[in-house]
């Protein structure tokens, strides 16, 4: 099959229409090339900004409508006011930054997938054939666990957690296969799955809460395996979900500024992270002032501002509860 042969299904066309009803520019789905890997994986499509327009580019034609719908639903969640992740900090090591961004985005996406997969199942976009292709995608991504375990436990746990979200309950045969091939990482993934499914995602607020929970629990698991933690609560900025009352609070009432060891990506100066006092999650990043402006007054002024004024100053998006 070639890209020109792909026909958009009515369900996917419906999603394209829904997205275009909200988005001020134009959103189009574009199928590219003729590659068919023989499995589905979430890296087979991407969103590309083209001026005011967004292109959903599907680069693998194994299951083009499923893959397009997945990406469209991610976009629909953002346009509907669900929190996003931002990466404003640098460790000074480009390779490490890249790894941390990939992992942080993956954890965030897994919580997204709780909603995305539910919507796909509602619209019959996940068939037994798609489930089979998804399982093949898991097997193409992670090898069975060796004894002793290797350095791919993080990837296995992420992949299996996402698979548990995708398959949901009632796939005993697949679970048995996972138990046989990945016993240690599956046990970890099941604990994390129970955590993010304990309370349903019913709003941007509950979505954000589950992302923060997963960031923290994933680090606890890595530390239990004596692996380096990802520190997404500091490295990854997550959109704040605030009430009107909270917007009028002083910054000091809702956030605590913390002098980070990392630097602001834009200015390359030491960074201050604004942590939400309720859950210790990075809500915004400030660049340290220039030496000439580095006075106690500088920080007092920031703490004295209202939350709304600070977000305006930083051009930081927020979501109203």
Q: What does each model-identified segment do?
A:
Residues 52-68:
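Short pre-active-site segment immediately N-terminal to the catalytic Zn-binding motif
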Residues 138-296:
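Pan-zinc metallopeptidase signature
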Residues 293-321:
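Hydrophobic, glycine-enriched assembly/anchoring segments
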